[in-house]
Amino acid sequence: MLKIIIPTIMLFPVIWYSNGNMIWINTTSYSLMISLMTLPLLNQTENNSNNFSLMFFSDSLSSPLLMLTVWLLPLMIMASQHHLTKEPLMRKKLYLSMLTFLQMFLIMTFTATELILFYILFEATLIPTLIIITRWGNQTERLNAGLYFLFYTLIGSLPLLVALIYVQNSLGSLNYLVMNMWSQDTSSLWSSNLLWLACIMAFMVKMPLYGLHLWLPKAHVEAPIAGSMVLAAVLLKLGGYGMLRLTMILNPTTKIMAYPFIMLCLWGMIMTSSICLRQTDLKSLIAYSSVSHMALVIVAILMQTPWSFMGATALMIAHGLTSSMLFCLANSNYERIHSRTMLLARGLQAFLPLMATWWLLASLTNLALPPFINLIGELFVIMASFSWSNLTIIMTGLNMLITALYSLYMLTMTQRGKFTYHIYNIKPSYTRENTLMSMHMLPLIMLTFNPKIIMGLTY
């Protein structure tokens, strides 16, 4: 594990010793090297667990998420170049250091064996994200967004700490590898339902569950591009990862407690998809679409069947790459037009034909077009929920329909139609941007050929 963590720590001297004209190329190439070094982790052993040490391990659930995290750092650095050009060198270095801190915390979160260590690192990811949003965001509302983000996450995860300390006292260990072999049943503890709620609530806020999702659109809209990318692609997956880890341990309570949450998610995903149809703000639309996709993941995790687990992990990885790509595209529009309103960005296909191709591909992956892994994930979840209750097919089917509607609405609003007169002198698309989009798209296409490496624990 140290072969990933130590190179990530060594990014700091690379950042601080680079001079102004080399800082981008140095950090991008170095972080790409780290992501290539992580690739062997995807090849899992027979017993499905690489126990590196007492502190860190990886299995087929954490290694795809780990890979997603390290793959995203070079992409975030590439996406941030344009809007940091006017900043002084010191601020550029600070910004890159924050991204590196975030990457380091995330790597350790996904591989921690001990639940308290996981909790500490889970909370530590909050600090760099908050600094990125409140320092480099575009509008003054970013402080409000940062406050929302901070309080929702902190208040959600305090009960988790209390519950973890209680479990530690009553059972003596919080190690994942030991907890799976528990002889004592959790339902014999004081009030297992409250314990379950306390453990799961932190991840529900992070996912976010419909009703606790109000921090997400605010944070996404106000964050700079790298903040939006890492928030959509990795930080939401932390919630899913924590839920997958804990619900397995908290059985059989999950089977009783899951009903209201499954109902809320099935209702919430239709609601948030419908909100997407009414959005004028491009980033806000993508943020709400994240909420509706993550609701499907919560449904899958709470159903506790092998198929739904496979669907949840596949959907998490697919959504990470897709939503990150959509935010990059929205940002490339914003850098040219200086507005997030879709009405002001009409008819861009005539000016940027290659960008229109990327827009089409991103919209199609977002609406789960076959053969992409988005569809594989969604189909697994829908089949699992259908066998749980036949009526869920109405909700999930309606959700797929509305998703297709707002994805195509987003595509036609930004690319087609009569262009507005203030975009005559916009810049062409740069090689950097096209490389960035292709590096989002390539993993999605490649995973289509071998989806089993992201199918998670049960495959």
Curated annotation (Swiss-Prot):
It is found in: Mitochondrion inner membrane. GO terms for biological process: electron transport coupled proton transport; mitochondrial electron transport, NADH to ubiquinone; mitochondrial respiratory chain complex I assembly. GO terms for cellular component: mitochondrial inner membrane. One of its GO terms (molecular function) is NADH dehydrogenase (ubiquinone) activity. The chain crosses the membrane at residues 20-42, 60-80, 92-112, 113-133, 147-167, 194-214, 224-244, 256-276, 284-303, 308-330, 351-373, 391-411. The keyword Chloroplast does not apply. It catalyses: a ubiquinone + NADH + 5 H(+)(in) = a ubiquinol + NAD(+) + 4 H(+)(out). PANTHER family: NADH-UBIQUINONE OXIDOREDUCTASE CHAIN 4. This is NADH-ubiquinone oxidoreductase chain 4. It comes from Microcebus simmonsi (Simmons's mouse lemur). The lineage of its organism: Eukaryota, Metazoa, Chordata, Craniata, Vertebrata.
